[in-house]
């Protein structure tokens, strides 16, 4: 079976990540008026990082060693994304009595706390992350984002293993 070129696959992944961010901001934030929680913001940052890695890989279009480096970076980001999606799904599965308290808006976090304290708070999530505000076919938003990360991961592994 002939696979599309390395460059085309990376461009498609970069476009896919751009599409995901556009849907998140355009539809969920602007149309449905859903404010992203801390873990949602981290997942968006990971999607943007994957898109940037894939775009750089497409522009650079390296030989085999470079392809493996870019694919490895992409796979590492996928693992990070799956971790944070899983963490949010775990928070959503907690009984109400175990859900952490809600935190303050991100804008205020960086005003009040040091950068390291604010980032630590972002990475832990809060009660807002446990709230299920949207579902499709029984799967909440972090579940669908995890599906996207798994898709990016499969493509990253194929890109890593393919011959130059």
Show the residue positions of the predicted features.
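Interfacial segments of alpha-helical transmembrane regions
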Residues: 4-15, 62-84, 154, 158
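Immediate flanking context of iron-sulfur cluster ligation sites
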Residues: 16-17, 21-35, 54-57, 120-121
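C-terminal TM-helix exit segments that contain a strictly Trp-centered aromatic cap at the helix terminus
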Residues: 23-28, 80-95
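Membrane-interface helix caps and helix-loop-helix hairpins in membrane proteins
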Residues: 31-38, 90, 135
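Non-cytosolic membrane-interface motifs at loop->transmembrane helix junctions
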Residues: 34-44, 70, 100-103
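Iron-sulfur (Fe-S) cluster-binding segments and ferredoxin-like electron-carrier domains
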Residues: 41-57, 107-111
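Extracytosolic (periplasmic/ER-lumenal) interhelical loops and adjacent juxtamembrane/interface segments
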Residues: 93-137
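A hydrophobic membrane-anchoring alpha-helix module
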Residues: 121-164
